[in-house]
Amino acid sequence: ELKMNIPYKFENTQEALEKLCKLISNFTKKAGINPEKVLNICINISGRVNPESGYSFSMFNFSELPLAEVLAKKIGYSVCIDNDTRAMTYGEYMQGCVKGEKNIIFVNISWGLGIGIIIDGKVYTGKSGFSGEFGHVNVFDNEILCHCGKKGCLETEASGSALHRILLERINNGECSILSSRIATKEDPLTLDEIIAAVNQEDLLCIEIVEEIGQKVGKQIAGLINLFNPELVIIGGTLSLTGDYITQPIKTSVRKYSLN
């Protein structure tokens, strides 16, 4: 078993796609596996992905060919693709905290916001593989433009990208944080990992924003519970690394707004 934590800037550019293929090729070489024994490489990316057709409709859609086919030609192996949150959901179902439950919702709170759904032990993909775009439910009456091109999406006020934006706005408006001096230097862009670290160092401003995000996400999770009646809801993704700072507000909102 070989695991590698590789720095990679995930952007919707041809250069980023080429970089990804190079990283995967290097990884397969370092793994020292006989190429003839590699049956398939599964690549999980964010956005709208149809795992059956191999098309990605949000990222790396520069060719008329399916992204899976483009990647296979560049890497030299058979490739399948899927949405990252759905893959995380399946991972939890097979090897994670699931203990026999067959109806599950996995909430991925990272830079974006998505969910994976398992119904009767099967991952639900929807007709075109676009299920789980939780972050793009229209919730807020705001003028914040989401990266999807629409306004009012849940993700605009309840996600890692929202945390990043709100924190910068509040620090620039004079509020204090242990990240204030870091932002004032204006060197490299502030990362989500740095904000998570500040939360876990008990930075009050960062904690306050995370708790507000937890309340908003929890209210919408309550709606999902009312719709799907799952046996288990799992909170994952980058923001879950803040622990109780995000999970407790989520639980409070779920208790307040859900029927079960």
Task: Annotate each predicted stretch with a short phrase.
Residues 83-85, 129, 212:
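Short beta->alpha linker loops
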Residues 3-103, 245-255:
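Glycine-rich phosphate-binding loop and adjoining helix at the ATP-binding site
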Residues 1-37, 75, 141-145, 150, ...:
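ATP-binding/phosphotransfer module of carbohydrate and carboxylate kinases, centering on a glycine-rich
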Residues 46-49, 110-112, 239:
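Short glycine-rich anion-binding loops that position phosphate/pyrophosphate groups of nucleotides
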